[in-house]
Every structure is written in structure tokens, then in C-alpha cells.
């Protein structure tokens, strides 16, 4: 069975397992039915009638909420070897998000376009996740 960073809505955050492999954060979910549509494995999406974009959007927002609630060990990005005190409101973390699928690790980057502007607590771009202090 494939593992994914997408969550079923009924799956509570404490059922989520985060682990780091080669610098990538892996989020496992044994329950998700929409993940197969995301990686194109040819399996059914579980009979859901929602459009693919809607399922991707819902899944990405769910994974963001799960990551924001989880305690993830990451190293802050320092400039010139010292903390950047000018940006005390936010800290930048270099995080590589990815899915774990049947064919191995699938980079998360192709799905960033599915995030709406202005997430609740963070701004996500291709290379970093900015968390509030």
C-alpha cells in the first residue's frame, strides 16, 4: 500500500506519523483514498465524486494542518552563521515535502499551485515553509 502526506478528514492528527528520510519529511496515512489519484497509480479514488483539483486542494490543506500541529525537528536557516534578529516574527526552515507512493518518493513541489493565497498560519513556497514564532 502506498503512503501519502494526504489525510482523510476523519483521521485525527495524533494518528499521523512524521519521519525524516534523506532530508524529506514523510507523512504516512493508511486511510487516504484520494492519494492514488494524485500520483496516477491507476487505482480508483475510492468512489468519490469530487473533482481531482478539489480533492488535491482538500488533501493539501489537511496535510498543512497536520504538519503545523506536529512537532517536527528542523534546523533554522541562518545567514552568515548567526541568527537573523531582524526577522524575529518568523523563522525560515528548509523543508522538502514529498509524498511516499508506489513508485517511491514523489516531490511535493508540483502540487504547490493548489494552495490558495494566504494560508492560515504560514506562507509556503517552493523551497521553504515559514512558520510563525
UniProtKB/Swiss-Prot annotation:
GO terms for cellular component: chloroplast; plastid. Belongs to the ycf68 family. This is Uncharacterized protein ycf68. Its main location: plastid. PANTHER family: ORF16-LACZ FUSION PROTEIN-RELATED. InterPro entries: Uncharacterised_Ycf68. Keywords: Chloroplast, Plastid. It is found in: Plastid, Chloroplast. It holds the Pfam family DUF2647.
